[in-house]
Amino acid sequence: MFAIVRTGGKQYRVAAGDKIAVEKLAGEAGDKITLGEVLLAGEGDSLADAAKVTVSAEIIAQAKSEKVIVFKKRRRHNYRRRNGHRQQMTLLRIVSVA
């Protein structure tokens, strides 16, 4: 069975056993959480009532994503700025979709 869940402003298609990286969620590695907002659920071609479906996940780790470099430059004015940013994220293992 699969489900479409929304967390951190993004939507993910998940099934039992999947690993996903989402925006940072509160909790430590090993904690069990429930992903609240299930938008769609089904199996194969048939769809189930999403209101009755719960998605359980386990936090694998709290990590940071790849670094994004922001570089600003104004030509002929000797103006250069270089900034880096690493977004915090949570790695999840989907335990069950029921």
Swiss-Prot record:
Cited Pfam families: Ribosomal_L21p (PF00829)
Entries under SUPFAM superfamilies matching the protein: L21p-like
Alphabetized UniProt keyword annotations: Ribonucleoprotein, Ribosomal protein, RNA-binding, rRNA-binding
Any one GO cellular component localisation term in the record: ribonucleoprotein complex
GO biological process: translation
Molecular function (Gene Ontology), one example: structural constituent of ribosome
Superkingdom of origin: Bacteria
InterPro entries given in the database record: bL21-like, bL21-like_sf, Ribosomal_bL21
Coiled-coil segments: none
Biological role: This protein binds to 23S rRNA in the presence of protein L20.
Family as reported in the entry's similarity comment: Belongs to the bacterial ribosomal protein bL21 family.
Subunit record text: Part of the 50S ribosomal subunit. Contacts protein L20.
NCBIfam families assigned: L21 (TIGR00061)
PANTHER family xrefs: 50S RIBOSOMAL PROTEIN L21, LARGE RIBOSOMAL SUBUNIT PROTEIN BL21M
Protein name as catalogued: Large ribosomal subunit protein bL21
UniProt organism field: Novosphingobium aromaticivorans (strain ATCC 700278 / DSM 12444 / CCUG 56034 / CIP 105152 / NBRC 16084 / F199)
